[in-house]
C-alpha cells in the first residue's frame, strides 16, 4: 500500500539497524500498551513494523504524492489509482492535525493552517483535503526534531496562497 501511496519504490534506510538497537523507550511503551490490551499482536512485531516505517527512505516528491493522495480522497494524483477509501481522508487528516507535530501540533496548526506530519529525516508533508498536498525536505532539525526550513517553506506557501484558516481572508457580513 505504501508503494501505491507514493507512486514509486521506497527503500529501508541504514538507520533501521541503529534505531532497532537503541529503541528502548519504544520497546517499553509497546509492552505497556500490550499490558493494557492496546496492542493486539506481538509487541516486538508491532514495534519492528513501526521502526521499519520510520526508516523508509523517501524523497520530497514521494511525500508530495502521498500528501496529494490523502488530499485527493485516496486517489493517487500521478497514477490516478484509488489507494484507500475516501472516507479515510478525514480520519487521516484529523490524526495528523492533532499529533503530526507531537507536542507542537497546536502551535503548528495555528501558525501554518495546514495539518502536517513531520519526519526525523527532515521531511514535512501537509494535507489540505480537496485542495492539495505539499511537502518540503531540509535535514537541519530544531530541538524537537522537526525541520526548520521545511516548516518555514510550508508556512510561506500557506500564507502566500491565503490558505491558513487562522489568518486568511476575512468575509464581510452585509445586512
Q: What does each model-identified segment do?
A:
Residues 13-79, 83:
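Active-site-proximal helix/loop microenvironment
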Residues 70-175:
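Structured C-terminal helix/loop/strand segments within mature extracytoplasmic catalytic/sensor domains
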Residues 6, 66, 121-122:
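Short glycine-rich loop/turn motifs that provide flexible caps or phosphate-binding loops at active sites
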Amino acid at each position: 500500500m505504501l508503494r501505491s501511496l507514493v507512486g514509486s519504490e521506497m527503500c529501508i534506510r541504514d538507520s533501521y539497524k541503529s534505531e532497532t538497537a537503541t529503541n528502548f523507550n519504544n520497546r517499553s511503551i509497546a509492552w505497556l500498551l500490550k499490558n493494557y490490551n492496546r496492542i493486539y499482536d506481538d509487541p516486538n512485531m508491532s514495534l519492528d513494523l513501526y521502526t521499519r516505517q520510520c526508516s523508509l527512505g523517501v524523497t520530497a516528491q514521494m511525500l508530495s504524492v502521498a500528501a496529494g493522495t490523502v488530499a485527493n480522497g485516496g486517489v493517487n494524483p500521478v497514477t490516478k489509482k484509488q489507494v484507500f477509501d475516501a472516507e479515510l481522508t478525514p480520519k487521516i487528516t484529523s490524526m495528523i492535525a492533532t499529533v503530526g507535530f507531537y507536542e507542537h501540533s497546536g502551535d503548528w496548526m495555528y501558525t501554518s493552517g495546514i495539518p502536517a506530519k513531520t519526519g526525523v529525516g527532515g521531511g514535512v508533508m501537509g494535507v489540505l483535503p480537496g485542495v492539495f498536498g505539499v511537502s518540503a525536505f531540509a535535514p537541519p532539525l530544531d530541538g524537537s526534531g522537526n525541520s526548520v526550513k521545511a516548516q518555514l517553506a510550508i508556512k510561506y506557501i500557506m500564507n502566500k496562497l491565503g490558505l491558513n484558516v487562522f489568518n486568511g481572508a476575512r468575509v464581510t457580513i452585509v445586512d
